[in-house]
Amino acid sequence: MMDSAKKSDALIMAEALRLVNEGVSVTFPVNGCSMLPFIVGGRDSVILEKPVDLCVGDVVLALTIPDNVLHLENVEKHYVIHRIVAFSGENVVLMGDGNLVQREYCKRTDVYAKVIGVVRPNGKKSLQGTFAERCAAKIWYILLPFRRYLLWIYKKVKK
């Protein structure tokens, strides 16, 4: 049985997705550290819109399964806000910017929203998909072998 907090979260997510599907932009708070350093959980919010065209490098909200359970049947799916790193036909491969190894998988139809911006605590908006943002994300992905050390430094500096 679902506890009341999870039930409340599920209702909020369902309403946000309904609005996005109707073409309304929704600002949604994020949790966790899987998108460091670009999106900080517990601090930033993301602006979600209905996904039209999906490209490698887009940050999306999707219902996914992690790569360590791909071979299992009836695996519980989870919503994540992660970056698209590859396509394989109708399948989408996602990875959090703060993740070292973990990838998630879903179908294109399981991508429910695209992040078009990040709202910082001071109200400043950082648009996603700009040339500068895409370059920074690409460089960050290339630095994957060093990400563990870069994230350690980032967390020490941000304390």
Regions flagged by a language model, labelled:
Residues 2-3:
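Plant-biased intrinsically disordered, low-complexity terminal regulatory segments
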Residues 6-100:
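Feature for secretory/organellar precursors and membrane-associated catalytic proteins
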Residues 52-53, 63-65, 69-159:
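Acidic/glycine-rich C-terminal interaction modules and beta/coil loop segments
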